[in-house]
Amino acid sequence: MAYEKSTDIFDISRSMFLYPWLEYPDRTKELRKAMAPVHLPLSCYQMPKEEFPPSPECWRQHPSKPNSVPYCYFNKPEIYTHWHDLYDQREEREAEKMLRKMRDDHRYIKEVHQTHIQMFHLPMSKLIIKSEMQSRPLEPTWDPLKWQRLRELTKSLESPREDEQLYAAQALGCLRISDKFVMKALQQVAQTGPEKVQYEAYRTLAILGCLNKHVIRALIKQLKEKNEGQRMETLTGLRMALNSWAAVSKDKRTQVGDEGKLVPVLQTLIKKSSSEASLEAALCLGFLRPRSNMVQEFLLQCLCQGLKTQQMKALRMLVKVMHVHSAPVIRAVLDQLCSSSVLEDRFEATQMLKTIGLEQIQAQGLEELTFNLLRRKTHNEPFLAVRQAVAQTVEELKLKPMMMNLVEAQLMNPDATARQEAVISLGVLGIRSPQVFHLLLDLLDAENRQAVKKSLQETLILCASIDPWIQNKLKNKVLSVYEAPKTNVKAEPTRFRKEPENPEELTIQDFRLAKLNPLFTAKSITKVGQKKTPAFPPYCSKPRKHRPQAIGPWQPRIKKQLRVLAEIAK
């Protein structure tokens, strides 16, 4: 029977010593195989022994933490004592450090819990509309790679190839770094470079904050050209530059060179250019002349026509810069909140309502319209982050108590869709009393619709992630929403139901183990034959039509509990 003769380490060493010039296949491989150490499992005599109960010597305070509570301290973690060759000393030290931190420092547990809670929410900082990045100098120690990139781009401005110069000028405008050597290189190429490079260099200088008379004159010359695309790029760059310029306080602003010549050119473009170019020109003029009646009238006309994104640009100028809070502006903000397809624009609309304030809304007679639309957005908005922003706006406008009363009363609506809407709204408005919390638990037991049960479950999880009282109440609860088998056995209440044998049937076993997508979608339920509600509500909201009652008996004890809740609220 053929077999492979095992390699002996002494034979290989002897042959290498006697004949070092010889080479043969797999020589290094065989040597490595022969030199590899053999790891054997620990014998029964080498395995660590456990003593029950542990000796008193193990119970002592940690040397570095004399004020901590004593615990049973071992030299090595138990989980790492089975094999010596699986973990090196560095990993063992890290494991010991982690175990000590978990035992001693209660703040570690708190940090882990807070990190887990953040999984439920999309941080508002991710949606806050940031002002356009201002140009700034860069220190070499801050970002060495970006500093090296700046050096390479400034050298490319001196390249004999025109396309390299053009690309370098565009890239420097995107980086928004206004160091002296960058500005000097751009000014030099703007005077001596080809025509296309000069055009891009002047545009980049304006974006970087250089608005002297030479740059403004070059931009005016470009705005008078017949090339529509080039004119649009110039207007966009000028608008970005003036936006950064207006963000600085008035006492620290630099004077815009040849402003008197730039204003008439912008006024002419507003009257004679295309809609998009006219809007950009109006925005540029709005930064220079915030009280211009011409700009205000043009932007108000833009609110009734054009794309939603263009309307949002006009709204930003009217609300934030020109401080126009008239009825058409408020209606346009509500329209953006209700029907805009851009997530950031809907979020920014909620911030605009805060800026306008309840007094201006009441003065324009739009309080009822605003209340009805905000109430609708607390449940039909697909993204949780925007629903949370709507709830914050409701609280800022002091409309939350009235809305909470209506939403809590809607929990007992016989229609399943109405109940689900109320449950989703409570997920962002919050649970303000123990009676409402227990009512939601009773609804979870009595509800037959799986969609409503799922919404109830998500609402309880969201409220538990921000309310310590609810979190403590649900600590040992199992929220199980799964398809019940079709049997004649009556199902037990959810709060006392045992866990199913198959854990895969559970949607969420424990709210502490749940990992909801921060932008989970609340699917709107529409019935067959039911008309779709318009995106923007009319001035006077119509009363809700009577919907058919849900099939199946309703729990009278929940109605009684709601009546008690209403009496307490009064």
Curated annotation (Swiss-Prot):
Q: Which SUPFAM superfamilies match?
A: ARM repeat (SSF48371)
Instruction: Extract the InterPro entries matched here.
Output: ARM-like, ARM-type_fold, HEATR9
Query: What is the superkingdom listed in this entry's lineage?
Result: Eukaryota
According to UniProt, the name of this protein is Protein HEATR9
Gene of origin?
HEATR9
